[in-house]
Amino acid sequence: MCKKTHRIIDFRPQANWYWLFDHNRAILTLNMGDRVIDIVYKPEMLILKFDQPVFFTIEDVANYMDLFEGPALGDYWPALRSQIILHALVANQFHKPIMPKNWLFESSVGEQPRVHKGDHIILKSSAIKEAKKYFVLDNDENFILCMLIEKSHGLTFNRNFVQFQIVKVTYDKIFATKADCNTLSQYV
C-alpha cells in the first residue's frame, strides 16, 4: 500500500528563483527550485536579452509580495494568485509594448468607469459576445493594460485569448468593474 504524502507549497519568493528562457521549448520559464512555471507569452512578444538565469530582484520580491498579500487577488487560490503575479511581473519586465486592440471588444453604454492598477474588469468580445474577467496591470488617461484571468476568452469563432494573455484597450470597452465581476451572467 502506497502512502500519500501531502506537501504544502510555499508561494513566497525565494532567493533561488530565477527566469530562464528554455531554448528547446522556446518558452520563458521561472525556476522556483522544486518546480518550473511556464510563462504563456510567445518569445516574439518578449524582450529577451539573456541566455543566463535572471534572478528575482528585491523589486520583484516586493512587487510579488504586495500583490500576493494584498486585497486585489485575495479571492484566488494561492497557486492561481502566484501565476497571475508571475505573468504580471513578466508583462512589466520582459513584454514588448503592445498596441490597443479595441476592435476585438464591444463598447459599453453609459459612463466610462475609471479603473486603477489591481482592479478587475469585464471585457466582452465584439464578434461572439463572450464576457470574461481581466486584471488591470496598468492604466493611463486613455488606455488600460489588462490580463485575462479566466482560462480562455473567445474573441471570434477562430480566435481565443489564453489565460494570462495581456491586451490594451480604451476605457469605453469596460463592461463592469470589480464590484460587478461576481455577476458575469448579466453581461453575456
From Swiss-Prot:
Single GO BP term: FtsZ-dependent cytokinesis
Any one annotated GO CC term: cytoplasm
Disulfide bridge map: none
Keyword Transmembrane: no
Keyword line: Cell cycle, Cell division, Cytoplasm, Septation
Keyword Metal-binding: no
Domain of life: Bacteria
Compartments it resides in: Cytoplasm
Family: Belongs to the ZapC family.
Job of this protein: Contributes to the efficiency of the cell division process by stabilizing the polymeric form of the cell division protein FtsZ. Acts by promoting interactions between FtsZ protofilaments and suppressing the GTPase activity of FtsZ.
Subunit structure: Interacts directly with FtsZ.
The name this protein goes by in its record: Cell division protein ZapC
Name of the gene: zapC
